[in-house]
A protein has these predicted regions:
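Gly/Ser/Thr-rich active-site loops/lids in small-molecule metabolic enzymes
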Residues: 107-112, 186, 190
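Mechanochemical coupling/switch segment within NTP-driven translocation systems
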Residues: 54-70
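Active-site activation/catalytic loop segments of kinase-like enzymes and analogous catalytic loops
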Residues: 110-143, 159-175
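ATP/Mg2+ or Mg2+-diphosphate-binding catalytic cores
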Residues: 44-46, 163-199
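A cross-family kinase active-site recognition segment
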Residues: 1-55, 76-78
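All-alpha amphipathic helical-bundle segments outside canonical DNA-binding/catalytic cores
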Residues: 144-156
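Active-site acidic catalytic loop and adjacent metal/ATP-binding pocket
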Residues: 7, 65-111
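Hydrophobic alpha-helical segments that form the core
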Residues: 26-31, 154-166
Length: 199
């Protein structure tokens, strides 16, 4: 089953949802993810960091910041999103996909949700296929502009480096221990490919 049913039921609230008076959620923007006041820790404190990774990741972060500044935060591309749509947060119940765990739900770019679907798997060969399935379902409720689709790799890198920070700041957790330094090492190729493509 693809994520189509989950998308139809849960994801694109931004186009029809009216924000109630007094409603507040945090924002997942560049600063919250990769800035100095990042919510899940500093990417520089990822496991196994060295001078080469600090330089490579730093150049990637700079490019992400520049691209997202150009991309903007207009209401057609930024609003309330789930912000943690990884596979562990999809539940199949009676043949239907349900989205769970809205703890991290907040205001962000809609295409950021596409990147969160691939959390911890961004480096695997099948990862792009997950995004294609996600887009298939997403397009049943909302058109995706070419500029949005073209920026998905930026959101993938934003998420990946945010997870590098999370692993570093949660090093005692079972998940972080299972990922270890290898997760940071596997990020090197992703950063290099991103810089070649967009740098």
């Amino acid at each position: 089953m693809t994520t189509s049913a989950a998308v139809q039921e849960s994801l694109y609230v931004g186009g029809t949802w009216q924000r109630p008076e007094g409603f507040e959620r945090f924002t997942w923007d560049f600063e919250a993810a990769l800035g100095e006041s990042s919510r899940w820790g500093r990417w520089r404190d990822g496991l196994g960091m060295d001078a080469m990774k600090l330089d490579l990741f730093g150049r990637t972060v700079d490019l992400i910041r520049d691209r997202l500044t150009s991309y903007g935060r207009g209401p057609d591309r930024f609003g309330l999103a789930h912000c943690d749509l990884r596979l562990a947060n999809l539940l199949v119940h009676e043949g239907r996909v349900k989205v769970i765990d809205f703890d991290d739900c907040g205001f962000s770019w809609y295409m950021y949700d596409a990147a969160t679907l691939m959390s911890f798997y961004e480096h695997l060969p099948g990862a792009p296929g997950l995004i294609e399935h996600w887009l298939e379902g997403y397009r049943t409720v909302r058109a995706v502009a070419k500029a949005e689709e073209e920026e998905i790799p930026t959101f993938v890198m934003l998420r990946r480096l945010l997870l590098v920070a999370w692993v570093g700041s949660h090093a005692e957790s079972d998940l972080a221990r299972s990922l270890g330094v290898a997760f940071t090492d596997q990020t090197v190729g992703l950063c290099s490919a991103y810089l070649r493509r967009f740098g």
